[in-house]
Amino acid sequence: RWEVRPSEGDALPAVPAIVPGCVFASYVAAGVEADPNFGDNAYRTDKSRYDRNFRYTGLFPTPPVGEGRTLWLRFEGVNRKGTVRLNGHQLGPLDGFMQAGDYDITRLVAPDGENRLEVEVEWVGYPVPNFRSPTYISSAGWDWMPYAPGLLSGITDDVYLSLSGDVRLVEPWVRTKVPDREHAKVELLTDVENRSDKACEGVLRGEIRPGGIAFSHPVRLEAGERRTIRLTEREVPGLAVEHPQLWWPNGMGDPALYTCRLVFETDGRQSDARTVTFGIREYGYEWHDGIFRLKINGEPVYVKGGNWGMSEWLLRCRGEEYDTRVALHRHMHFNMIRNWIGSTTDEEFYDACDRHGIMIWDDFWLNSHPNLPHDLGAFQQNAVEK
């Protein structure tokens, strides 16, 4: 259960909060503000009431953790800055709407009863483009959307709990190469982190479907060590895939997808697990008779696409709604969407594009103004997260 209110003063009451979402959308849903999608309501709002910091408060029960397990609290994004506290303990700052936060809360949760999670969200401030980036720079108003009260401040991405053992898998991803249509090379990368104060030995197991490609790789980690594991066909012969089901853009073939299930085991017990969905594809670029040409899997692509300004101007598009909206682009015979100024950050958007054969021209959070962000360090850190 979430609630949001101004950090100071009584300009607005406390209301149930929509998480993920922006502050202003919560006040619209609570009936404090008229729906800005009708009439001239967007221009009648007293914007000054939202030009301030807000505090989110969430309550949750302590889940069963188990012996030797670690309880994690994960934040996927807060706009623009956030300070996270659990039961009075500060967990850390978040800076930029793409920066994720992973917090070990095993010893901070209440043994019984409810836990109090507080997030102080700092208002974005002026001027927005490009000084306040990384943020939704169109929130200050554009030719296609009005000013968004509060500049889309809020807990704008998912917040959730997870469990792991002493060793966890961090940010696994897959890279593929397609030398020809009958052969592909799959490269798997993941960080493994030993959170204990003792060295450990374990096994990284994986299975890729379809195809039933199974593998195992022994790993030894020193106490507190974090290391990147890279597996190619040299370590796992099955990662040289014969007759692969290739991912093709809309109109060129099926957008085939694979899943890779990774499990790290210590002493025969699962410590952590992750699942990655990916397409076997390889992009290429070339100049042909003075023309820049995009290729995929060795074939030239005639790009047909449109500009995706935002999912919804108050960030109210979630989950399966992305599938409907991306499917409309497929039905229009598009094969590319430009994620304009990086204004859509949800994983559901990228997953829907994968399923429907839509390539993404993915911008960062800068427009054509020559000015740079005030905090280049935060911009660069968020670029790595993206």
Feature locations, PLM:
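Active-site loop/turn elements of alpha/beta-hydrolase fold enzymes
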Residues: 364-366
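Acidic-and-aromatic substrate-binding clefts and catalytic sites of carbohydrate-active enzymes
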Residues: 337-347, 369-372, 376-378
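An active-site-proximal structural segment forming one wall of the substrate-binding cleft
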Residues: 379-386
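Hydrophobic residues in well-ordered beta-strands that form the structural core
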Residues: 360-362
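Secreted/periplasmic carbohydrate-active enzymes, especially glycoside hydrolases
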Residues: 1-340, 344, 352-356, 385
